[in-house]
Amino acid sequence: MSSRTIVPSLFASRESYRRDAEAIELPASAGKPMSISYSELADLVHQVRAQLASWQLPKGTVVCSSLVNSLEFVVVFLATADLGLVAAPLNPNYKESEVTFYLEDTKTPALIVPAGTLSGTDASEGALAAKRAADALSVRVVEIVYGAKTLQLVDANGASTPSADATEASEDDTALILHTSGTTGRPKAVPLTHKNLLTSMHNIKLTYSLSPSDKTFLVMPLFHVH
C-alpha cells in the first residue's frame, strides 16, 4: 500500500515502522483464535484488493457485506476502501426484508458473506437471509474464505482471479456508508470520506493518548456507528 492519505495507508506506515508488530488478535472466544501482524494484514489486504479489482467496478461503487466482527470484516473494508470503492457493512442479523432495503438503497452489485453461505452449510440465519435478499435482486453473492493466511473471494462460478489493473482512492473519496437507525423514519445513508475517518481516528488517538504499545479491546459491532 502507498503513502496516500487514505485509511489503508495507516497500515502501510505502521508496516514500515515494524512489520512484525501485532495488528489484530482474535481471542479463543472468537471461534478461531489467531494473531495477525501488520505485515500479514497488509498481505491479506493486497490479496483481496487484487481480487476485487478483477470485478472491474467503477470507482465509487458500493460493495455491501454481511459479516460479524472478524479478520474477514477488517480486510474486506480496507481492501474495498483502498481500491476507491465504498464499503457498506450491514448488520449480519438483519432479516431478509431489511437486507433488501439496504441493497436497494445502496444500489450495490455485490454482497460479501461468510464462508458456507452459498452451500447453506454452517451458515447463520442472518447470512442465509442476506443471500435470499441478494438473490431476489440479482445481486452477486460472494463468500470470503480464509485458509492458511490467505483470503479468497468465491461466488457460484468459483474464485475471483487477481488483477493488477486497479483504481486508487484519494482522501476526499467516500470510503464508508453507514445508515441511521431509522427510529423516526426510513434509515438514511451517511457517507464518510477517508478524510472523515482519518480525522476521527486522529482525535481518538489524541484523546486517549494512544501509542504503539497500547492494545484496544473491541466489543462493539464493526458495522455500527461508533
What positions do the PLM features span?
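A short N-terminal helical cap/helix-turn-helix that marks the beginning
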Residues: 2-25, 43
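Conserved pre-ATP/AMP-binding loop-to-beta segment of ANL
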Residues: 19-22, 159-179, 185-186, 209-215
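Conserved AMP-binding/adenylate-forming core of the ANL superfamily
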Residues: 23-78, 95-100, 168, 192-194
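ANL superfamily adenylate-forming
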Residues: 30, 34, 116-171
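Conserved AMP-binding A3 loop
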Residues: 35-39, 168, 175-202
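Short beta-strand->loop structural element characteristic of the AMP-binding/adenylate-forming
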Residues: 64-66, 73, 77, 81-112, ...
